């Protein structure tokens, strides 16, 4: 069985732009991951009206853009509820200096919208464990980061990769505490 992965960043960006939706793929993914990590249901469409309200003044999305969002949602659910402890981030992947700046902006967009998504899901952060609170504090600080064009860009690219891995760890920590899980068959009685 082949593993289903996130759609390509540029194709989603083009579709969102052609649908006149003022959201980037990184923002969309951050919002969905945040809502899921905040406890939003994983097996229904409750995320769609929230997405429409937040990104399009309550208006539904065109079917092609919604199909891509559905694909991103499903891949994200599979990653967050799976056993691999892996999380893919939908970030720009352009080469060169401009690509590095776009990647840094994408990380910031993802993190800011992740935090917004948690709020939209109604997360009660005051009830969070110290680990989850620390993860959220780290994400709030990461959202403020940027690339300094006067410093060594090669070194900053390496640091950005470390930041991305830390973002993933923070997201997984928060999701482990607040995120919805698929119903397990272990608690259901066996029918003979």
From Swiss-Prot:
- Matching InterPro entries, A to Z? YgfB-like, YgfB-like_sf
Q: Where is the signal peptide?
A: none
What's one Pfam family the UniProt record gives for this protein? Answer: UPF0149
Q: Name one GO cellular component term.
A: cytosol
Provide the family line: Belongs to the UPF0149 family.
Q: Which HAMAP family match?
A: UPF0149
- Name of the protein in question: UPF0149 protein VIBHAR_03551
Tell me the organism.
Answer: Vibrio campbellii (strain ATCC BAA-1116)
**What high-level taxonomic lineage is stated for the organism?**
Bacteria, Pseudomonadati, Pseudomonadota, Gammaproteobacteria, Vibrionales
